[in-house]
Amino acid sequence: MNIRKAVLADSMGIAKVHVDSWRTTYKNIIPAAFLSNLSYDSRTDLWNGNISKEGNYVFVAENSDGDIIGFADCGKRESNHFPESGDLTAIYLLEEYQGKGIGQGLLEQVFLQFEELGFNRIFVEVLEDNKTRYFYEYYGAELYKTKKITIAGAELNLLIYEWNNIRNVLIKF
């Protein structure tokens, strides 16, 4: 497995992981019609923008064949007004690669990037029914607040977690 910073040529591979992992992660959480309508093409366009955006950092995990099997995205959301803070905006792996330490590797790269930026307080948003919340809790994230959101007509609970000292996370790797 290899983890590296993403380049524009990775957009299609990231989009495939994004769509496929949403379909498995959010099955029975987000309406099926919404998930089935997700498009590789539109997500490729999204990732072209995300990779190119200044202040946004995207990392990919590749298998031994060089195929992208996971990714993480981080930076600072426009809605984040806290000084010296950032946001983990996405971390997804294809289902068959979960539980093998790859997510940990991606999280480490994100936190090393935050350390380089001088960020010490990190936020991540996760749907309440998404089991990834336990991954964040394992690495020391604490619940900051909750809010209701609507996706495809379904009202869902969004949990906002925070890490308030990235050094405490980095020593776990």
What are these regions (language model features)?
Residues M1-N2, M12-K16, T89, Q104, I122:
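Short amphipathic alpha-helical segments
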Residues M1-M12, R167-F173:
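Conserved N-terminal entry element of GNAT/NAT acetyltransferase domains
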Residues K5-A9, V19-I29, L35-E96, L107-Q109, ...:
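Acetyl-CoA-dependent GNAT
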Residues G86, N120-R133, E137-Y139, K145-F173:
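C-terminal "cap" of GNAT-fold acetyltransferases
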Residues D67, A90-E108, E115-L117, L127-Y134, ...:
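Conserved glycine-rich acetyl-CoA-binding loop
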